[in-house]
C-alpha cells in the first residue's frame, strides 16, 4: 500500500531519537546544530550557531562539510515542524551517523518559546 508523506514521517519517528527543546538547549553546547530547511527559511531566522544543508541535498553534501567528517559526532537536526528533520535523521543513521537526534517541534516550537534566533548566514555549500 502506498504511503503518504505523513506516513513516512511517522515511520521515521519510530527509528530515531526525538528530543524536546530543553534537551536540545542542553545538548547545543557540544553538538552540531543542523538546519535542513530551505535557504530562504534559514535566512529568515534560525537557531544560533546552526548550519544549513537543505533536506533535498543533505545526503549528497553532508560528507563534504568539515564538521561532519566524523560519523560519531553529536548532531541535532531541525526543520520547521520536525517532519523533514525526522526523515533526515533516519537517513543519516542509515549512512552511519550514530549521534543523530531530531528536535521535536522544530524551529516553530523554538521561536514560539521565544528562544534566541539568529539571522546571520551560515549556509554550507550555497
Task: Please describe what each predicted stretch is.
Residues 78:
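Short, surface-exposed ligand- or partner-binding patches at beta-edge/loop junctions that are enriched
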Residues 1-32, 39-74, 83-126:
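Rhodanese-like catalytic fold shared by cysteine-dependent sulfurtransferases
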Amino acid at each position: 500500500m502506498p504511503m503518504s508523506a505523513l506516513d513516512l514521517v511517522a515511520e521515521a519517528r519510530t527509528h530515531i531519537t526525538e528530543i524536546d527543546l530543553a534537551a536540545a538547549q542542553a545538548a547545543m553546547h557540544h553538538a552540531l546544530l543542523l538546519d535542513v530547511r530551505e535557504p530562504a527559511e534559514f535566512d529568515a531566522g534560525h537557531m544560533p550557531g546552526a548550519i544549513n544543508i537543505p533536506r533535498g541535498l543533505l545526503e549528497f553534501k553532508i560528507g563534504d562539510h568539515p564538521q561532519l567528517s566524523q560519523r560519531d559526532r553529536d548532531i541535532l537536526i531541525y526543520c520547521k515542524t520536525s517532519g523533514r528533520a525526522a526523515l533526515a535523521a533516519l537517513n543519516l543513521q542509515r549512512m552511519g551517523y550514530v549521534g543523530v537526534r531530531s528536535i521535536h517541534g522544530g524551529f516553530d516550537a523554538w521561536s514560539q518559546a521565544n528562544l534566541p534566533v539568529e539571522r546571520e548566514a551560515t549556509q554550507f555549500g550555497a
